Amino acid sequence: MSDDQQYNQDKLSQDFQNTSIGSGEQQQQSYQQYQQQPQQNNFNANSAPTFTPSGQQGGYQGGYQGGYQGGYQNYSQGGYQNYNQGYQNYNQGYQGYQNNNRGGYNNYNNRGGYNNYNNYNQQDQQPVQNQGMSLADFQKQQNAQANLNKPKKTLKLASSSGIKLANAKKAPETESKEATPAATEKEATPAATEKEATPAATEKEATPAATEKETTPAPAKKEATPASVKSESKPASKSTSKVATKESTPVTSDKVIQEQVDEVDEEVVKDMFGGKDHVSIIFMGHVDAGKSTMGGNILYLTGSVDKRTVDKYEREAKDAGRQGWYLSWVMDTNKEERSDGKTIEVGKAYFETEKRRYTILDAPGHKMYVSEMIGGASQADVGILVISARKGEYETGFEKGGQTREHALLAKTQGVNKIIVVVNKMDDPTVGWAEDRYKDCITKLGTFLKGIGYAKDDIIFMPVSGYTGAGIKDRVNPKDCPWYSGPSLLEFLDNMKTMQRHINGPFMLPISGKMKDMGTIIEGKIESGHIKKGGNLLLMPNKASIEVVAIFNETEQECDAAFCGEQVRLKIKGVEEEDLAPGYVLTSPLKPIKTITRFEAQIAIVELKSILSNGFSCVMHLHTAIEEVTFIELKHKLEKGTNRKSKKPPAFAKKGMKVIAILETNESVCAETYADYPQLGRFTLRDQGTTIAIGKITKVL
């Protein structure tokens, strides 16, 4: 470093006159001229009042090196473009300034490498302040900078790291983590400092935050500066530390952070609902078994429906000559259902106990409405099979043509793996809580349920009276029923093992219903993943992008998020209501559900009058979708007991056989393999009003 270089105020104006604005080459020469000079911040005791020794901030040096040198570094590190960009901005600003255009003048003030030239002018006009720095401190700083310069031609390193070090010294508490090691190791490890400093330096010229930093006063000034200047320096250092951190973070980490944000801890869900998980239960059984009455009584006993409403229904039922039906009217809401005393649609209701939240799906028991029942069963976690103990009614429901057997089979096919058999109407005069009648009912049904695949542990029997409420919330009175000491229905449901939920799986919601109400609203059960308000989804098989505008839970209340296993209504944007159909699936755009027309499946034929061969067509119920399907090829017959595949393809299939076949649908249908998502990979085949087969998708073709 040459000792004869001193700060000269007049020299500054000469420098800027000599600097050409018109030619990039001349500008570069000018840069080189200053690059050859190791540094411009020699100490002179006489110029202490107006000289800032750090050489990086404020005054002539800050203006000159912060602007020129900072710009030059960007030119050499980031390539010619960065340099050119700053240069053009300056050029535009300069022209604007010449034309006395105020807007252009602002640009001149705010952009390019010449920021600090203005800063110099402003400083010049301000009253001179006393700025002191001890000789020892200054020499320490000079030594550090000399060390950085020693073996390398890294004038740019000294300049950029100097800025960083100055700031680190001034306000360590606001500095980023990277800057702190740079400050502590500045003398010992120049290489480390270089690493730390580079990310910040690369962005210096482009970022207003960094430019701001260059104009802030140096540490020496801090002791004697008024509060106003001090307050200016803090935000600058804060914003600069942000720049440094942002630059040094790898791009991929953004994705990781996003994934972590999207992940939902099960504990969070517990906190949100007070530790209560959600269970969907479906009431199934033959017509007139008492499903709706029992559902209505549960709502009344749990306080979901108040006494006034029930009293009102009782009066209305009495007036209509249907006195005993008033509890079922809580579930059956339309006139046709009330006048005929039978459910047509799948009724939905919600109740809550101390331990869990429940959605009741009240399935129609009539033969004509089996497809509605299948749609309901596909959304349920637990099945409640209601059978009537009344003489004649049980037999009608259980015999061929009755819905008790078919509902139990359909529930199993749709993934309802736990079934509670509720023997209802035990208080009827023809029964009178008789143990013999109860045993008679459960023996035949138990054998049938085991035959269709229910494990012994997954079947529970209990006697109740849906009308009086005995055995529903409280246990049955021992005086009436001394032979049964098991739990009541709600007691059992509350203490049942918790369901497994894929809260962090890819989002999938098969649409079970749609409506128009100030926008498009769809409803269904979330089979996998979770959704937040404002989230983006994909509608399959349309491949339409959807935005979730609002989420409504079981109680019709708006909420911010919904999770796997919940019954929800979503208000969506991006598709019209007429373009939706039950069976469409809202899915995650990152891992969408598959859309298929041809697949391989394992099929068990449960009821078939004739035989089935290639070309046979029937109706397939898959989650909430209903689609016509054709047998393209029967590939293998499976042996009973061992499930061994036959080498030759069978010519036909008949009742009781298990086969592997290739099926084809007319339209694209959303599905997954049974192994990946059981709820979206199992199906039922129906023909002429009866369930002929059940199956699971083994391969998508």
From Swiss-Prot:
Belongs to the TRAFAC class translation factor GTPase superfamily. Classic translation factor GTPase family. ERF3 subfamily. It is found in: Cytoplasm. Residues 465-467 are annotated as: G5. Residues 132-271 are annotated as: Charged. Residues 424-427 are annotated as: G4. This is Eukaryotic peptide chain release factor GTP-binding subunit. The modification Phosphothreonine is found at T359. The gene is SUP35. Residues 170-224 have a biased composition (Basic and acidic residues). Residues 276-501 form the tr-type G domain. GO terms for molecular function: GTP binding; GTPase activity; translation release factor activity. GTP binds at residues 285-292, 362-366, 424-427. Residues 1-25, 41-54, 228-252 have a biased composition (Polar residues). Keywords: Cytoplasm, GTP-binding, Nucleotide-binding, Phosphoprotein, Protein biosynthesis, Repeat. Involved in translation termination. Stimulates the activity of ERF1. Binds guanine nucleotides. Residues 1-63, 91-124, 164-259 are annotated as: Disordered. One of its GO terms (biological process) is cytoplasmic translational termination. Residues 26-40 have a biased composition (Low complexity).
